[in-house]
UniProtKB/Swiss-Prot annotation:
It is a single-pass membrane protein. Gene3D superfamilies: Phosphoglycerate mutase-like. Belongs to the phosphoglycerate mutase family. BPG-dependent PGAM subfamily. GO terms for molecular function: protein serine/threonine phosphatase activity. It is found in: Mitochondrion outer membrane. It is an enzyme of class 3 (hydrolase). The keyword Translocase does not apply. Its EC number is 3.1.3.16. The gene is pgam5. GO terms for cellular component: mitochondrial outer membrane. This is Serine/threonine-protein phosphatase PGAM5, mitochondrial.
Amino acid sequence: MYLRKALIAGGSAAAAAAAILGAAAVGKSKGGPDLDILSVVPAATGQWDRNWDRREPISMVNLSKINGETGEEELQLHLNKHKPKATRHIFLIRHSQYKQDGKTDFDRVLTPLGREQADLTGKRLSSLGFKYNHIVYSTMTRAKETTEIISKYLPDVKKSSSDLLREGAPIRPEPQVCHWKPDFVYYEDGSRIEAAFRHFIHRADPKQEADSYEILICHANVIRYIVCRALQLPPEAWLRMFLNNGSISYLVIRPNGNVSLRMLGDSGFMPPEKISRT
């Protein structure tokens, strides 16, 4: 009976995946506009999708290889093999204040206040006492400079960069705002930022034994979109939140796929005169 239920669940997931991949292959959704596979964002339903990251153990097993009548013990072995054990702690840091009048990204360096903010954020992260595993930062100048300053307080933490975390317009916001953008902007940026979510935000690998503490240093739009997606809230709501420069948001992903938000845009560790939102 357990196996039969698993096969049904697996079949539903496979059918949904096949439908999406099929639509992507022909470049169009049924009766709709062009479809980019990375832009397919599940609609918020009010029900928690346990397999939101496609890493639920049952979806990691090739059910067609399991004997439908006698394979329950074999299935359980496979499920145990793919069951995560560790919790992932993910800190999302918005870059510090920068010179917005720069003509190119290279010119948009941190302001003196921005450097102070990054220093305060680095001290705050260090004071939390976590054993951080990795820092990943956006390749944009303001994020790179923020990372350099924060890293002074976390000298032994390895660092790497990712273009996926660059700033952009993830999805047309609701309610709509006055600074209109053409559809192609969301079409291009949205695919990349959705890819960033799928790449960085998921439950731990089954091989991971200990809890991990990871830092992503990037941009307000990226962080707000990731938070909406991680909590399975309508992603169009991303612009309803404000994040101060150098602020800390904190997601926790449990082995069973449950996600909680412990901080959103925390900048209470900064003196009031050091806070900005550029």
